[in-house]
Amino acid sequence: MGPSCLLFLCLLLCGGPELCYPQTQWLLPGGTPTPAGSSSPVEVECKEAELVVTVRRDLFGTGKLVQPGDLTLGSEGCQPLVAVDTDVVRLNAQLHECSSGVQVTEDALVYNTFLLHDPRPVNGLSILRTNRVEVPIECRYPRQGNVSSHPIQPTWVPFSATVSSEEKLAFSLRLMEEDWNTEKSSPTFHLGEVAHLQAEVQTGSHLPLQLFVDHCVATPSPLPGQNSSPHHFIVDSHGCLVDGLSESFSAFQVPRPRPETLQFTVDVFHFANSSRNTVYITCHLKVAPANQIPDKLNKACSFNKTSQSWLPVEGDADICDCCSNGNCSNSSSSEFETHEPAQWSTLVSRNRRHVTDEADVTVGPLIFLGKANDQAVEGWTSSAQTSVALGLGLATVAFLTLAAIVLGVTRKCHTSSYLVSLPQ
């Protein structure tokens, strides 16, 4: 078969001349494969108290070098040390300065942050040749062993008599799979899906405790109180899951799996006026003695659309009545009732200095696919089985159609070659 026929068949099957020749592959931030021997465009080194992020200036593998000034680490308050070489940019920062949140699991401390490439026009031009991309970064540290130089307190000391620091109770907030048995492996969601959140406290040697979610707020950036506009309250008024009042079916799970665990679902969403496709959820968790009767300040209430009423996970139904007007406080705790996000961080940190039974925990980023920036993050999620099946079906139909065309073209090319060779 002549070269022209081969080229025609390649154009017909591949759809363009650029696919008919060997192509160099690069590892983009979205996870596209790299050629053998090439390094990842973003490398992270998690040290004892700091992290070092090394970014290839040819971040997208296109030959267009990113500007060091367009790279940031974590929230706006983070100011890492930046070292620029010919080919790479290194960002060095302390974990506590640039981490967007800390998650506590059974065996690890997990620090979350993100690398942001936000290109700006240069030289007075109004065009951009690189994309905006946000790369989630995670550093995990094992929790095994006693890191304190002080003697371990006896395990028989009652909770009410124990003077301890906040670290004595390990609070956590995790994204779970639909069956609640395992932690979710991917942070990506599509609109219409449901996020399964599990709040938990490791009580250790304390007497039995019961966990409550006092309030939760969702923001496009990690820290409420910083860049807190826009924001959306999921839980408010000391345990009212107010997100369920809208068109969603967000609710606490009944019954609890354990007193120290509380599970709830949230219909996923994204912020309409935000350029980010990420959402961080920060919850204020607290505990009370397990034998304490739930009340207006310690409750877990969901809105039931069928009965148009608030229902508690446990306790009398009237403890949820205050969710309708948001007045679930009393005179001694009214300071907590009105908490705009900009005031939240300061308020909580000030009041938690002398409190050992509550903590703020952040989970995120939740990454929403389907927006403009998703090409950079879509590589982190597994291909959906439905999409694969649909793709295979379409490919089969296309192959059968093209096979008939190819067969006809092949015969024509063969006949033409035979006729030309006759005079010889």
From Swiss-Prot:
<dbReference type="GO" id="GO:0005886">
    <property type="term" value="C:plasma membrane"/>
</dbReference>
<keyword id="KW-0472">Membrane</keyword>
<dbReference type="GO" id="GO:2000368">
    <property type="term" value="P:positive regulation of acrosomal vesicle exocytosis"/>
</dbReference>
<comment type="subunit">
    <text>Polymers of ZP2 and ZP3 organized into long filaments cross-linked by ZP1 homodimers. Interacts with ZP1 and ZP2.</text>
</comment>
<dbReference type="GO" id="GO:0005615">
    <property type="term" value="C:extracellular space"/>
</dbReference>
<dbReference type="GO" id="GO:0002455">
    <property type="term" value="P:humoral immune response mediated by circulating immunoglobulin"/>
</dbReference>
<keyword id="KW-0325">Glycoprotein</keyword>
<dbReference type="GO" id="GO:0035804">
    <property type="term" value="F:structural constituent of egg coat"/>
</dbReference>
<keyword id="KW-0165">Cleavage on pair of basic residues</keyword>
<dbReference type="InterPro" id="IPR055356">
    <property type="entry name" value="ZP-N"/>
</dbReference>
<dbReference type="GO" id="GO:0045893">
    <property type="term" value="P:positive regulation of DNA-templated transcription"/>
</dbReference>
<feature type="domain" description="ZP">
    <location>
        <begin position="45"/>
        <end position="308"/>
    </location>
</feature>
<dbReference type="GO" id="GO:2000360">
    <property type="term" value="P:negative regulation of binding of sperm to zona pellucida"/>
</dbReference>
<protein>
    <recommendedName>
        <fullName>Zona pellucida sperm-binding protein 3</fullName>
    </recommendedName>
</protein>
<dbReference type="GO" id="GO:2000344">
    <property type="term" value="P:positive regulation of acrosome reaction"/>
</dbReference>
<dbReference type="GO" id="GO:0030246">
    <property type="term" value="F:carbohydrate binding"/>
</dbReference>
<feature type="glycosylation site" description="O-linked (GalNAc...) threonine">
    <location>
        <position position="34"/>
    </location>
</feature>
<dbReference type="GO" id="GO:0001825">
    <property type="term" value="P:blastocyst formation"/>
</dbReference>
<feature type="disulfide bond">
    <location>
        <begin position="216"/>
        <end position="283"/>
    </location>
</feature>
<dbReference type="InterPro" id="IPR055355">
    <property type="entry name" value="ZP-C"/>
</dbReference>
<feature type="disulfide bond">
    <location>
        <begin position="46"/>
        <end position="139"/>
    </location>
</feature>
<feature type="disulfide bond">
    <location>
        <begin position="78"/>
        <end position="98"/>
    </location>
</feature>
<feature type="glycosylation site" description="O-linked (GalNAc...) threonine">
    <location>
        <position position="155"/>
    </location>
</feature>
<dbReference type="GO" id="GO:0032190">
    <property type="term" value="F:acrosin binding"/>
</dbReference>
<dbReference type="GO" id="GO:0062023">
    <property type="term" value="C:collagen-containing extracellular matrix"/>
</dbReference>
<dbReference type="GO" id="GO:2000388">
    <property type="term" value="P:positive regulation of antral ovarian follicle growth"/>
</dbReference>
<keyword id="KW-0873">Pyrrolidone carboxylic acid</keyword>
<keyword id="KW-0675">Receptor</keyword>
<feature type="glycosylation site" description="N-linked (GlcNAc...) asparagine">
    <location>
        <position position="304"/>
    </location>
</feature>
<dbReference type="GO" id="GO:0032729">
    <property type="term" value="P:positive regulation of type II interferon production"/>
</dbReference>
<keyword id="KW-1015">Disulfide bond</keyword>
<dbReference type="GO" id="GO:0042102">
    <property type="term" value="P:positive regulation of T cell proliferation"/>
</dbReference>
<dbReference type="GO" id="GO:0002922">
    <property type="term" value="P:positive regulation of humoral immune response"/>
</dbReference>
<keyword id="KW-0278">Fertilization</keyword>
<dbReference type="Pfam" id="PF00100">
    <property type="entry name" value="Zona_pellucida"/>
</dbReference>
<feature type="topological domain" description="Extracellular">
    <location>
        <begin position="23"/>
        <end position="387"/>
    </location>
</feature>
<comment type="function">
    <text>Component of the zona pellucida, an extracellular matrix surrounding oocytes which mediates sperm binding, induction of the acrosome reaction and prevents post-fertilization polyspermy. The zona pellucida is composed of 3 to 4 glycoproteins, ZP1, ZP2, ZP3, and ZP4. ZP3 is essential for sperm binding and zona matrix formation.</text>
</comment>
<keyword id="KW-0732">Signal</keyword>
<dbReference type="GO" id="GO:0031012">
    <property type="term" value="C:extracellular matrix"/>
</dbReference>
<dbReference type="InterPro" id="IPR048290">
    <property type="entry name" value="ZP_chr"/>
</dbReference>
<dbReference type="GO" id="GO:0007339">
    <property type="term" value="P:binding of sperm to zona pellucida"/>
</dbReference>
<dbReference type="GO" id="GO:0042802">
    <property type="term" value="F:identical protein binding"/>
</dbReference>
